[in-house]
From Swiss-Prot:
Its EC number is 2.5.1.7. It is found in: Cytoplasm. InterPro entries: Enolpyruvate_Tfrase_dom (IPR001986), Enolpyruvate_Tfrase_sf (IPR036968), MurA_subfamily (IPR050068), RNA3'P_cycl/enolpyr_Trfase_a/b (IPR013792), UDP_GlcNAc_COvinyl_MurA (IPR005750). Disulfide bonds: none annotated. This is UDP-N-acetylglucosamine 1-carboxyvinyltransferase. Keywords: Cell cycle, Cell division, Cell shape, Cell wall biogenesis/degradation, Cytoplasm, Peptidoglycan synthesis, Pyruvate, Transferase.
Length: 419
């Protein structure tokens, strides 16, 4: 397994170009299964999960090519089953189910790897499709969906806010007979992006970005060209990188209006922030950040995917900051690793209490999940000495060429190939 070796401390500053959003690119790739004409999706990041999704679409019979943009022609899809060997590495593959059953009347997806029903809400995807008239069976580790004729529009009230299930229901409803209303829908910018992509293909959707999305079913979707929005979490990660190293950064190809909660907290931490139409600049003027209190919640509140980065910020900030995680359980696995580097924190239930220290020391640490691993790499950039981050395949799932981008900002980082 590959590792990162990081030599610190360094001040991170300069310019970085933000990639397309993984969490919009993936649902958009699967939504292309709904289209009866070729589709071109631009600004798709080069990531492991994207490669896996493209492989899966090919196995279903779609023609998939990448030359800068991703081109998908789903006219000849003739396989309706997403097999375990591809699904086991990526939960996003559940998004194939809605488009398959909506367009072809049948679909099967292996239960995502290590996913017990109820822990991550696959059950919300299932109940949504059932309310649209699909018959669902769980057999031999597969979710099997079928319908005679077309799905039927429905008034769906979601038990809890779920980005993934909102995508599934919205995609399936585009080809359903009649009108579907999703109440308590997720409001994330990536949901808006997928809705806009579907509208480009001919879907009739309104209310995206609010908690009530209305979809009027159409007979078919055509082709089109669409550009994925910039990755707000990658943007936030690089802004934090500059903040904790007391540096200055400009993020290009960014979308500032998707980051209001994060920018507000960075300003509270003492950062000088300016925004343009497609750029964000942050300047710490050489000052140490101040600790901030953060509570994660669904959009437009503070995103859970920025929690680990702000935990790190608090751990090197002036003062004590509280970080409360309300979206996912077990999302503090980076804290013991950061403690190995000299951080001072206590975890009480779903809150981590961060006591800022002047400096961190390099250590051997292990990445546990995507965002936690990014925070460990950033910690290595500002720690004294050498930090080795193990299991970085987590990072490769969500950040495009993170080491190249950090190096351009002044980091001393190298990828060490695993045996």
């Amino acid at each position: 397994m590959d590792k990162f070796r990081v030599q610190g401390p360094t001040k991170l500053q300069g310019e970085v170009t933000i990639s397309g959003a993984k969490n919009a690119a993936l649902p958009n790739l699967f939504a292309a299964l709904l289209a009866e004409e070729p589709v071109e999706i631009q600004n798709v990041p080069k990531l492991k999960d994207v490669d896996t999704s493209m492989k899966l679409l090919s196995q279903l019979g779609a023609k998939v090519e990448r030359n800068g943009s991703v081109h998908i022609d789903a006219r000849d899809v003739n396989v309706f089953c997403a097999p375990y060997d591809l699904v086991k590495t990526m939960r996003a593959s559940i998004w194939a189910l809605g488009p398959l059953v909506a367009r072809f009347g049948q679909g099967q997806v292996s239960l995502p790897g290590g996913c017990t029903i109820g822990a991550r809400p696959v059950d919300l995807h299932i109940s949504g499709l059932e309310q649209l008239g699909a018959t669902i069976k769980l057999e031999e580790g597969y979710v099997k969906a079928s319908v005679d004729g077309r799905l039927k529009g429905a008034h769906i009230v979601m038990d809890k806010v779920s980005v993934g299930a909102t995508v599934t229901i919205m995609c399936a409803a585009t080809l359903a007979e009649g009108t579907t209303i999703i109440e308590n829908a997720a409001r994330e910018p990536e949901i808006v992006d997928t809705a806009n992509f579907l509208i480009t293909l001919g879907a009739k959707i309104s209310g995206q970005g609010t908690d009530r999305i209305v979809i009027e079913g159409v007979e078919r979707l055509g082709g089109g060209v669409y550009r994925v929005l910039p990755d707000r979490i990658e943007t936030g990660t690089f802004l934090v990188a500059a903040a904790i190293s007391r540096g200055k950064i400009i993020c290009r190809n960014a979308q500032p209006d998707t980051l209001d909660a994060v920018l507000a907290k960075l300003r509270d931490a003492g950062a000088d922030i300016e925004v343009g139409e497609d750029w964000i600049s942050l300047d710490m003027h050489g000052k140490r950040p101040k600790a901030v209190n953060v509570r994660t919640a669904p959009h437009p509140a503070f995103p859970t995917d920025m929690q680990a980065q702000f935990t790190l910020l608090n751990l090197v900030a002036e003062g004590t900051g509280f970080i409360t995680e309300t979206v996912f359980e077990n999302r503090f696995m980076h804290v013991p690793e950061l403690s190995r580097m000299g951080a001072h924190a206590e975890i009480e239930s779903n809150t981590v209490i961060c006591h800022g220290v002047e400096k961190l020391s390099g250590a051997q640490v292990m990445a546990t999940d995507l965002r936690a691993s990014a925070s460990l790499v950033l910690a290595g950039c500002i720690a004294e000495g050498t930090t080795v981050v193990d299991r970085i395949y987590h990072i490769d799932r969500g950040y495009e060429r993170i080491e190249d981008k950090l190096r351009a900002l002044g980091a001393n980082i190298e990828r060490v190939k695993g045996e």
